[in-house]
Amino acid sequence: MNKNILTIFMFGLLLSFNSFIQADSEKIESDGTVAEFNYFTVTDPSKFMTALNKFNKSECAKKWRDESGADTSLWSLRGSGSSHFILVVYENWNEMEKGRAVFTSCADAAMMIKSFQTSTDTNRSWNWISENALAGRNWQTNSVFSKINFKVDEGRELEYAAAWKKLMNSQLDNVPGSFGLNTISYGNRYVSHMVYLGADSMSELSNALKNVRSTSDFAEFASSVQDIRVGVNTELVQYVTSFNGE
């Protein structure tokens, strides 16, 4: 009898421990990263990629990566006024400062930027700088994203973040991939924040969005933020390639 009670107790303790480990692995917090989103409307894809690949193999790009840890990739867009963006991620503001110092001082970078005059519609080029506010799971394991751009009333940012975090904590089983909330620190005239939801395929992403939006938790979230948030647009983002010198 005592042996059975001990077995039940140990089994319950094991379940509790596993639940603790699972909850701990699903932390939703800032990863500390900052990023440049450089938006382009590409008119000559071949010239555009040639310029990017040439710079990628340059000494300037190597120095840029080595001194700042810049993580650079190209993404395609649908549901946007732009066709692509180049994403440059740094671990923190100090690394971005190092990276900007190198990038803006070398001829190879200047030549690449000049080449965009013949491969993109430069009248429609723009950029912003974001800072991660909350993140769950590793976004770099996913290849397709829903990126939701919106504006939050000034002074209500923490209120929105708390509501969004509560929603995502309730939807961990419905979201197979990564997710995050970024604050747009610079270039925020029209957009103050973006939310991303990642997956490994468009069908997986679509199903995740449908599942989340069909819940009472989402209805509660939407109701709680409707007076402090204005939606701008939702973009489908797909991975194209990374630039790591190879």
Put a short name on every predicted segment.
Residues I8-F17:
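Bacterial N-terminal signal peptides
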Residues M1-F9:
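Bacterial N-terminal signal peptides that target proteins for export
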